[in-house]
């Protein structure tokens, strides 16, 4: 991959901030996908890692833990009502949801091994949907507006570029 197409620290910051700013202003998810698409190098998981770490940060923000778990049942229906997933799309979303939870729990999922069988270049989109769902769920759990969670998460340092 040419150097100009590799993820950069600036791209990581931009991806994180663009998603948080978009959610804070209640932007349409598909609008965010279009806005963030130029950051995604072909045949690369970036910025998926950024969004999975952001989702894990949202779990941390709302205090989800083994002692006080965030229920996943109904997560998609409650927090991504504008999205419709069918067949393998459900499996991809489930993987991203569980990968973010694994990051929150202190493990590092093998994204490349997983997405190799997908035969598509869309992990980053499912990671984005996951971040949106977890941020909305965190806001619901805390009883605060989504923009409040986004503002708090924006103050936290992001994770380095992959």
Predicted regions and their residues:
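Solvent-exposed interaction surfaces and binding hotspots enriched for charged
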Residues: 1-162
């Amino acid at each position: 991959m040419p150097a100009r197409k590799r993820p950069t620290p600036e791209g990581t910051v931009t991806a994180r901030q663009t998603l948080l700013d978009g959610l804070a202003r209640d932007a349409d998810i598909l609008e965010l996908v279009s806005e963030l698409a130029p950051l995604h190098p072909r045949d690369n998981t970036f910025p998926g890692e950024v969004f999975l770490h952001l989702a894990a940060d949202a779990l941390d923000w709302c205090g989800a833990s083994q002692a006080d778990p965030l229920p996943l049942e109904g997560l998609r229906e409650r927090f991504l009502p504008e999205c419709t997933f069918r067949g393998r799309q459900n499996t991809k979303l489930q993987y991203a949801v569980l990968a973010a939870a694994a990051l929150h729990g202190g493990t590092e999922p093998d994204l490349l091994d997983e997405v190799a069988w997908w035969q598509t270049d869309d992990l980053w989109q499912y990671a984005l949907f996951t971040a949106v769902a977890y941020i909305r769920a965190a806001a619901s759990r805390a009883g605060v507006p989504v923009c409040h969670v986004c503002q708090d998460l924006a103050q936290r340092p992001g994770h380095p570029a992959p």
